[in-house]
Amino acid sequence: MPFNIPNSNKPRIVIIGGGFAGFKFANRIDSKIYQIVLIDKNNYFQFQPLFYQVAMSGIEPSSICFPLRKNFRNKKDIFIRTLDIAEIDPIHKVIYTDTGSLVYDVLIIATGSQTNYYGNLNFEKYTIPLKSVSEALYLRNCILNDLEQAVLSNDASAQERLMNIIIIGGGPTGVELAGALSEMKKHILPKDYPDLDASKMQIHLIQASSRLLDTMTEKASLKAYEELTKMGVCIHLNTKVTDIKEDQLELSNGLFLKSQKIIWAAGVVGTAIKGLEVAHNAPGRKISVNQYCEVPIWKDVYALGDIAYMETAKYPSGLPGLAPVALQQASYLAKRLNKSNLKNRLAFNYWDKGSMATIGRSKAVLQYKSLFLSGFIAWIGWLFVHIYYLIGVRNKLIVFINWLWNYIIYDQALRLNIKPKIPQSTKQ
């Protein structure tokens, strides 16, 4: 039995990836019809939209994660395996790992996306990504550790590098992170670090295009720009990064910025798997799928979420890489596969539920079709939408209490610089 998964008379569906798409599909597919195997490198689901709040000490990591095994403990004939995929043979329907191989009948590719450094090794070496909970914790530790080091330093230049923060990418992640950092500078630094001059801390937000939040309307972009400018964020539009060194960044306008924390939020690319290279033929290294989420070049292979490139009449350049797309595709495909007659099928139709981004306390932008909201109402909408999509009652409650507490007292209670302790016996 490969991976201790018993043979079954039912068709075996293997899901690669436990993100929004893979997690939702595994919940919706009928285990009375199929044997289900969910493979992910982690044993938990992580709620990506709130990574930046973990990095800013606003919420604890466990409140945006949910154990996969706990979620499926009452569902029969589903097997969770924590593995790294080495290669997939879609012709013979075999998955290879370092542990062994596994045969499938139906393959669901939901590997998501990873940070795109555009082939620049320096960008990858000297910046901090924000695509996982572990990376969010690493960024949190970097921020706190550098502030502690800044308190000890009498060198103005060193303090500048330790206190300044540079964010590359003016999409939702970059905007939300810049706003959270600005509020930390205003409300937290003077109280926790009275020995430091908080006014010397600079937050730079760099965007290659002509506006922030360029996937939203111009109203949203302008509002985000105005609010962040009022909050003291230095915004660089129409500006590209030409080079990055250990603690210095060079911009296309000739400006040099110094910081030990350069955060990369400037784009993603599909997570590729060996053996599927021929399918990664779409922009952003995605896998082209038809209107039924099928990978046309192979039988019984489907792709969902960020890894899938699906063109529609409304989205000729492909559906956006958003959680609602992944969730809707997963529900659609599970419903299709649960039916016995797959020939009578309807094409996937994406329902655009709008987009939103928070800028700071009581500040957000929200758009749905022709409706545009900003300020407190949009912020409340952002809060409740994110609480709604969190997995687990405990997580919803903890995040709500943390947000309420932070709102009332202007403080964040999770500023802990926890460094991993490596046992001496492993230091070989």
Where in the sequence are the language-model features?
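FAD-binding core/adjacent interface of flavoenzyme oxidoreductases
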Residues: 1-12, 78-168, 263
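Short glycine-rich anion-binding loops that position phosphate/pyrophosphate groups of nucleotides
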Residues: 21, 112-115, 178, 268-270
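FAD-site-proximal beta/loop scaffold in flavoenzymes
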Residues: 125-155, 248, 256-328
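A Rossmann-like FAD-binding core segment of flavoenzymes
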Residues: 76-87, 182-291, 297
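Rossmann-like dinucleotide-binding core of oxidoreductases
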Residues: 159-216, 223, 234, 320-337, ...
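C-terminal, flexible cofactor-proximal segment of oxidoreductases
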Residues: 329, 334-428
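Beta1-alpha1 glycine-rich phosphate/pyrophosphate-binding loop at the start
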Residues: 2-79, 172-215
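Short hydrophobic core segments
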Residues: 16, 102-112, 241, 257-267, ...
